[in-house]
C-alpha cells in the first residue's frame, strides 16, 4: 500500500482545527504570515492574521523580476487566504526576513491553477533555496498535487531552517518557466527541538550500536505528522497540524483506536506540553483482541510512509499509556522495528515514562531505501515481545513525526512525483469552469451515464466469454518474439544462441510447469525484484533460473522492462544470458541460464565452513577478472556506454565451471550518447555501501560509478567481511576506510581473509590492492577505466602464477602500459610502487629481479587483454 506523503500537509485550511491542545505553553518569538500578491492585511478562516508583502522583505528587483495576480478560479475546499493571490517570478527573486537566531518553521503555500491570462501554474517549474539549503529543485506544484493521496487542490511544504540573523528565501524559475508562491509562514521553535533527541536526549541510529548526533546547523523537511488513532488536530504554539493515520496504516493490520474517557495528560520536564497536544497523547492505536490476545502474535501494527529514497530521516514516535488496566511495569511490552531493523527491542511505555497518562517520545534516524527508486516505502512495525511473558500481547502508538534531513551538500529536494493517473483523465484545473444551466446538464448527464453503463455491461460480458474460452484451451507453447512484441511464432525449439534482438516468450503454463507452480522449496534467491526459482524447461533438458516479480516489489514493471530490453540485446560470456520471459495472467517472469555455483557472496561468506571450501586466491582473481571483463564490455563494447548501477557480490554469479556472469540489469542505464556528453543526470539508484559517493551527492552518473562499486567488491574479495560492521572498533566499522587506512600504513596483509594468508603472494597482493584502492577514490576522475582494471587484475594473476611457479618472494613490482614504472610517493595509490625506470629493470628489497617484457618485446604480454592497446569505440 503506497500513500504519498503529500496528504500530510494538504489539509483544508477552510476546515477549523479541533482540539487545540490548551495546555501548550510555548510562545514563539517570531510569527510571520505573508499573503503573497495581496495589497492588504486579511484574516483566514481559522482566525490567523495574514499581512501583505512589504518593501522590507522584497528584493530590490521587484518590478523586473516579479508580478502579482489573482487566481482565475477557486476550487471547493480552497480558502480565500492565502490561495487566491500569488506572486509570480520571471527571474531569480529573494525575500529577506529578519528573524531571531535559531531554528524556524518555514511553510510555503502553493495553489497550482491559472492566474488570469498571464500565468498558468500547471506549467510552472522552479527551485527554492534558503540560506544555502536547496529546498526544492525543478519543483512542480501541479505534479505534486496530482500525486497526493487523497486528492487535494493545494500543497503546503513545511521545512525547519536554522537561521543566524536573516532568512533569505530565493525562488528561481527553471528554463522557459515561471515560479510562484501564494503564502509564506515563518514560526520560531524551541531551541534544539528536533536535534537534541527524544525525552531521554538520545537519537537511536537504527542498525548501528552508536547513537546519532544531529548538528544545530541541520535543516529538515516535515514529511509526516500523524495523530495515530485520532482525527486531525492542531496545536496553538507552533501551529502544527497532526493528521489522522487512517491513510497510512496497513488495512490488514490496522488494530483498534480505543476510546478513553476524559483524561488529563501529565506533562513533565522531559516531555513539556508543547511537544505534542493533549489530543495526540489521549488517542492511540493498539492491536486489540482482548478476548484472544494470542491472535496479536500473528500480525504487526504496520505503517508505510512513502518518502524520497536515499535520504536520512528523523523518526519521532510519541507514546502515552492510557489503558487503566496497565498499571505496572511489564504488562504491555513490545518491540519497534523501522525499515525491518530492530529500533527498540523492549518497549515498556509504563516503565519508561514513569506511569499512566505520562507522555514520552523517542527519536530514531534511518536511511530510507537503497537509492533504487524515486520513492521508497519506509516501514514502521510494532509487535508484542513474547520473551518476557507480558500480561497483554499488545502494542500502542500515539503519534508519529517523520522529517527528512539535508544531505552533505545541503540538499532536501527530491524528484517530482509521477501522477497517480493520466493527466488526460484529470479535470483541467487550469481552465476556469463555466457554470451552465443545470436544467440542460441533468438530462445530458443521465443520457451519457446510461450509455456508459450499457457499454460497460457489454464489454464485461465479452471479456467473461473470452476468459472462459481461454481457460478451456490453455496456451502451453512458447514463442520467439522481438522487442517490442511482434507477431508470435509457433517455433518452440530452443536455440543454442539467441539472436541479439530476440528472446523466447514463455506461456504461464510453461513457467508454472517449470517451477512446480512456484513451489517454495525451489526458491534459490530473494531480491528487491522478487523470488528466484530453480526450474526445468523443455522436458527437463535445461535447468533455468526463474525470476518472478512480486506484487509488493519496490522495483516493479519498469525494472522488469529494463532488464528484458538490456539482456535481450546484449550477449557476452561474462554477462548472464536471458533465455526468455512471460507476461501473462498479471505475472512478470524472466528466465535465465541456471548458475549452479550461486553468487560470489555465497562463496565469500560461507554458511557451512566445514563443507564449503574457501575460494583460493587464484580462483578469486579469475572471478574478479571475469566480472571486470563483463563491465568492460558494457562500458566500451556496445554501441553506447551502458552503466550497470548495481554491481555487488550478490549480482556476480558463477556457472558450473566458476565462469563469472554479471547479472541483474534492472537498474541499468544508457550512458552519454554523444561526444559532447560526459555524464547523465538521474535519480540516485543502487545499493548503499556500493554506491558511488560522487553520484550520490551530485546525481551525476558516469561509468566511473560502476568502477567504484566494483572496487568495493574487490575489497570484499580481499578481506571477506561485510562493508559495514557494528561489533568492531569504530575505525574498523567501514570496510573502505579500514582498507584505505591500512593501505596508507602498508599493513594490508594484516587485514586480508585469514584463508588467504598461506596462499596469496606479496606481489600479486600489492598490484590487487593498488587497483582496488584506486577504484574506490571519492572523485570519479581519480578512478581508472575498466580497461585499466582488467589489465591490472590480469597482471596480478600473472604475478601470482609466476611467483608460485618460481617460488619467488618478490616484494615489489609495478607495470604500466607505457613501459614506465612510477616512483614512490606518499599517496595512497603508490604505496606499493617502489621501482623506477623501465619495467625490465624492476628492483626489489631482496635484490631479486623479475623481468616482464622489456620494452614490450617479451612474450609475457600475451597473457594480458588486447586492451594494452586501447582503441576508441
UniProtKB/Swiss-Prot annotation:
<feature type="glycosylation site" description="N-linked (GlcNAc...) asparagine">
    <location>
        <position position="216"/>
    </location>
</feature>
<dbReference type="Pfam" id="PF12819">
    <property type="entry name" value="Malectin_like"/>
</dbReference>
<feature type="region of interest" description="Disordered">
    <location>
        <begin position="813"/>
        <end position="843"/>
    </location>
</feature>
<feature type="glycosylation site" description="N-linked (GlcNAc...) asparagine">
    <location>
        <position position="49"/>
    </location>
</feature>
<feature type="topological domain" description="Extracellular">
    <location>
        <begin position="22"/>
        <end position="445"/>
    </location>
</feature>
<dbReference type="GO" id="GO:0004674">
    <property type="term" value="F:protein serine/threonine kinase activity"/>
</dbReference>
<dbReference type="InterPro" id="IPR011009">
    <property type="entry name" value="Kinase-like_dom_sf"/>
</dbReference>
<feature type="glycosylation site" description="N-linked (GlcNAc...) asparagine">
    <location>
        <position position="138"/>
    </location>
</feature>
<feature type="glycosylation site" description="N-linked (GlcNAc...) asparagine">
    <location>
        <position position="168"/>
    </location>
</feature>
<dbReference type="GO" id="GO:0005524">
    <property type="term" value="F:ATP binding"/>
</dbReference>
<feature type="glycosylation site" description="N-linked (GlcNAc...) asparagine">
    <location>
        <position position="266"/>
    </location>
</feature>
<dbReference type="InterPro" id="IPR000719">
    <property type="entry name" value="Prot_kinase_dom"/>
</dbReference>
<feature type="glycosylation site" description="N-linked (GlcNAc...) asparagine">
    <location>
        <position position="340"/>
    </location>
</feature>
<feature type="compositionally biased region" description="Polar residues">
    <location>
        <begin position="833"/>
        <end position="843"/>
    </location>
</feature>
<keyword id="KW-0325">Glycoprotein</keyword>
<feature type="active site" description="Proton acceptor">
    <location>
        <position position="646"/>
    </location>
</feature>
<protein>
    <recommendedName>
        <fullName>Putative receptor-like protein kinase At5g39000</fullName>
        <ecNumber>2.7.11.-</ecNumber>
    </recommendedName>
</protein>
<dbReference type="GO" id="GO:0004714">
    <property type="term" value="F:transmembrane receptor protein tyrosine kinase activity"/>
</dbReference>
<dbReference type="GO" id="GO:0016020">
    <property type="term" value="C:membrane"/>
</dbReference>
<dbReference type="InterPro" id="IPR024788">
    <property type="entry name" value="Malectin-like_Carb-bd_dom"/>
</dbReference>
<dbReference type="GO" id="GO:0010038">
    <property type="term" value="P:response to metal ion"/>
</dbReference>
<feature type="domain" description="Protein kinase">
    <location>
        <begin position="518"/>
        <end position="803"/>
    </location>
</feature>
<feature type="glycosylation site" description="N-linked (GlcNAc...) asparagine">
    <location>
        <position position="64"/>
    </location>
</feature>
<feature type="topological domain" description="Cytoplasmic">
    <location>
        <begin position="467"/>
        <end position="873"/>
    </location>
</feature>
<keyword id="KW-0812">Transmembrane</keyword>
<dbReference type="InterPro" id="IPR017441">
    <property type="entry name" value="Protein_kinase_ATP_BS"/>
</dbReference>
<feature type="binding site">
    <location>
        <begin position="524"/>
        <end position="532"/>
    </location>
    <ligand>
        <name>ATP</name>
    </ligand>
</feature>
<feature type="binding site">
    <location>
        <position position="547"/>
    </location>
    <ligand>
        <name>ATP</name>
    </ligand>
</feature>
<dbReference type="InterPro" id="IPR008271">
    <property type="entry name" value="Ser/Thr_kinase_AS"/>
</dbReference>
<keyword id="KW-0067">ATP-binding</keyword>
<dbReference type="GO" id="GO:0009536">
    <property type="term" value="C:plastid"/>
</dbReference>
<feature type="transmembrane region" description="Helical">
    <location>
        <begin position="446"/>
        <end position="466"/>
    </location>
</feature>
<dbReference type="InterPro" id="IPR045272">
    <property type="entry name" value="ANXUR1/2-like"/>
</dbReference>
<comment type="similarity">
    <text>Belongs to the protein kinase superfamily. Ser/Thr protein kinase family.</text>
</comment>
<keyword id="KW-0808">Transferase</keyword>
<feature type="region of interest" description="Disordered">
    <location>
        <begin position="472"/>
        <end position="494"/>
    </location>
</feature>
<feature type="glycosylation site" description="N-linked (GlcNAc...) asparagine">
    <location>
        <position position="300"/>
    </location>
</feature>
<dbReference type="Pfam" id="PF07714">
    <property type="entry name" value="PK_Tyr_Ser-Thr"/>
</dbReference>
<keyword id="KW-1133">Transmembrane helix</keyword>
<keyword id="KW-0547">Nucleotide-binding</keyword>
<keyword id="KW-0732">Signal</keyword>
<feature type="signal peptide">
    <location>
        <begin position="1"/>
        <end position="21"/>
    </location>
</feature>
Amino acid at each position: 500500500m503506497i500513500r504519498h506523503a503529500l496528504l500530510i500537509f494538504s489539509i483544508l485550511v477552510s476546515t477549523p482545527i479541533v482540539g487545540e491542545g490548551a495546555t501548550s505553553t510555548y510562545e514563539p518569538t517570531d510569527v510571520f504570515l505573508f499573503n503573497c500578491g495581496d495589497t492588504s492585511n486579511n484574516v483566514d478562516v481559522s482566525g490567523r492574521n495574514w499581512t501583505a508583502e512589504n518593501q522590507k522583505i522584497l528584493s530590490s528587483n521587484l518590478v523586473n523580476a516579479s508580478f502579482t495576480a489573482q487566481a482565475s478560479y477557486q476550487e471547493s475546499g480552497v480558502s480565500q487566504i492565502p490561495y487566491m493571490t500569488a506572486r509570480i517570478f520571471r527571474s531569480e527573486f529573494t525575500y529577506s526576513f529578519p528573524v531571531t537566531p535559531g531554528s524556524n518553521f518555514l511553510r510555503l503555500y502553493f495553489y497550482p491553477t491559472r492566474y488570469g491570462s498571464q500565468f498558468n501554474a500547471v506549467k510552472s517549474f522552479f527551485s527554492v533555496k534558503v540560506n544555502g539549503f536547496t529546498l526544492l529543485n525543478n519543483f512542480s506544484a501541479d505534479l505534486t498535487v496530482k500525486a497526493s493521496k487523497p486528492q487535494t487542490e493545494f500543497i503546503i511544504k513545511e521545512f525547519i531552517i536554522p537561521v543566524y540573523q536573516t532568512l533569505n528565501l530565493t525562488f528561481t524559475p527553471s528554463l522557459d518557466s515561471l515560479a510562484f508562491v501564494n503564502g509564506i509562514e515563518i514560526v520560531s521553535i524551541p531551541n534544539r527541538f528536533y536535534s537534541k533527541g527524544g525525552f531521554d536526549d538520545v537519537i537511536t541510529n537504527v542498525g548501528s550500536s552508536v547513537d546519532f548526533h544531529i548538528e544545530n546547523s541541520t535543516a529538515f523537511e516535515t514529511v509526516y505528522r500523524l495523530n495515530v488513532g485520532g482525527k486531525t488536530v492542531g496545536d496553538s504554539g507552533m501551529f502544527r497540524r497532526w493528521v489522522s493515520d487512517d491513510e497510512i496504516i496497513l488495512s490488514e493490520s490496522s488494530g483498534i483506536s480505543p476510546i478513553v474517557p476524559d483524561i488529563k495528560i501529565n506533562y513533565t520536564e522531559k516531555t513539556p506540553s508543547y511537544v505534542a497536544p493533549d489530543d495526540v497523547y489521549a488517542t492511540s492505536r493498539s492491536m486489540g483482541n482482548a478476548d484472544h490476545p494470542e491472535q496479536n502474535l500473528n500480525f504487526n501494527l504496520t505503517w508505510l510512509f512513502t518518502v524520497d529514497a536515499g535520504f536520512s530521516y528523523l523518526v519521532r514516535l510519541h507514546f502515552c499509556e492510557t489503558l487503566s488496566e496497565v498499571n505496572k511495569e511489564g504488562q504491555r511490552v513490545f518491540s519497534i522495528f523501522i525499515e525491518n531493523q530492530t529500533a527498540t527491542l523492549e518497549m515498556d511505555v509504563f516503565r519508561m515514562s514513569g506511569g499512566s497518562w505520562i507522555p514520552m517520545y523517542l527519536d530514531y534516524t534511518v536511511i530510507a531505501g537503497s537509492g533504487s527508486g524515486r520513492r521508497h516505502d519506509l516501514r514502521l512495525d510494532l509487535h508484542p515481545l513474547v520473551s518476557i511473558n507480558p500480561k497483554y500481547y499488545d502494542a500502542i502508538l500515539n503519534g508519529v513525526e517523520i522529517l527528512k534531513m539535508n544531505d552533505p551538500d545541503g540538499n532536501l529536494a527530491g524528484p517530482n512525483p509521477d501522477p497517480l493517473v493520466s493527466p488526460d483523465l484529470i479535470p483541467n484545473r487550469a481552465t476556469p469552469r463555466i457554470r451552465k444551466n443545470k436544467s440542460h446538464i441533468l438530462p445530458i448527464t443521465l443520457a451519457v451515464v446510461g450509455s456508459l453503463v450499457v457499454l460497460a455491461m457489454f464489454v464485461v460480458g465479452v471479456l467473461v466469454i473470452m476468459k472462459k474460452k481461454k481457460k478451456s484451451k490453455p496456451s502451453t507453447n512458447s514463442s520467439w518474439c522481438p522487442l517490442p512484441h511482434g507477431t508470435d511464432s509457433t517455433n518452440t525449439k530452443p536455440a543454442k544462441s539467441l539472436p541479439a534482438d530476440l528472446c523466447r516468450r514463455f506461456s504461464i503454463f510453461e513457467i508454472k510447469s517449470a517451477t512446480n507452480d512456484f513451489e517454495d522449496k525451489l526458491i534459490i534467491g530473494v531480491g528487491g525484484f522478487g523470488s528466484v526459482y530453480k526450474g526445468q524447461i523443455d522436458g527437463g533438458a535445461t535447468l533455468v533460473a526463474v525470476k518472478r516479480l512480486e506484487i509488493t516489489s519496490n522495483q516493479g514493471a519498469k525494472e522488469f522492462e529494463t532488464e528484458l530490453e538490456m539482456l535481450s540485446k546484449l550477449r557476452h560470456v561474462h554477462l548472464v544470458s536471458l533465455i526468455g520471459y512471460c507476461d501473462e495472467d498479471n505475472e512478470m517472469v524472466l528466465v535465465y541460464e541456471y548458475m549452479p555455483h550461486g553468487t560470489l557472496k555465497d562463496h565469500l561468506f560461507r554458511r557451512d565452513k566445514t563443507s564449503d571450501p574457501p575460494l583460493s586466491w587464484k580462483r578469486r582473481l579469475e572471478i574478479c577478472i571475469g566480472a571486470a571483463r563483463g563491465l568492460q564490455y558494457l562500458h566500451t563494447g556496445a554501441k553506447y556506454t551502458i552503466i550497470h548501477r548495481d554491481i555487488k557480490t550478490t549480482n556476480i554469479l558463477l556457472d558450473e565451471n566458476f565462469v563469472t556472469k554479471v547479472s541483474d540489469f534492472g537498474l541499468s542505464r544508457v550512458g552519454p550518447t554523444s561526444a559532447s556528453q560526459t555524464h547523465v543526470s538521474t535519480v540516485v539508484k543502487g545499493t548503499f555501501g556500493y554506491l558511488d559517493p560522487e553520484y550520490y551527492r551530485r546525481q551525476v552518473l558516469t561509468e566511473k560509478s560502476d568502477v567504484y562499486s566494483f572496487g568495493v567488491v574487490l575489497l570484499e574479495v580481499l578481506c571477506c567481511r561485510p562493508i559495514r560492521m557494528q561489533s568492531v572498533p569504530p575505525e574498523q566499522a567501514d570496510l573502505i576506510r579500514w582498507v584505505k587506512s591500512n593501505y596508507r600504513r602498508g599493513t594490508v596483509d594484516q587485514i586480508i581473509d585469514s584463508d588467504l594468508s598461506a596462499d596469496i603472494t606479496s606481489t600479486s597482493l600489492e598490484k590487487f590492492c593498488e587497483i582496488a584502492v584506486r577504484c574506490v577514490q571519492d572523485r570519479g576522475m581519480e578512478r581508472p577505466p575498466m580497461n585499466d582494471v582488467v589489465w591490472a587484475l590480469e597482471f596480478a594473476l600473472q604475478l601470482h602464477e609466476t611467483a608460485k611457479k618460481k617460488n619467488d618472494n618478490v616484494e615489489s613490482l609495478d607495470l604500466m602500459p607505457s613501459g614506465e614504472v612510477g616512483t614512490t610517493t606518499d599517496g595512497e595509490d603508490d604505496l606499493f610502487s617502489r621501482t623506477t625506470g623501465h619495467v625490465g629493470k624492476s628492483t626489489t628489497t631482496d635484490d631479486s629481479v623479475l623481468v616482464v617484457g622489456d620494452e614490450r618485446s617479451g612474450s609475457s604480454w600475451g597473457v594480458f587483454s588486447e586492451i594494452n592497446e586501447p582503441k576508441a569505440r
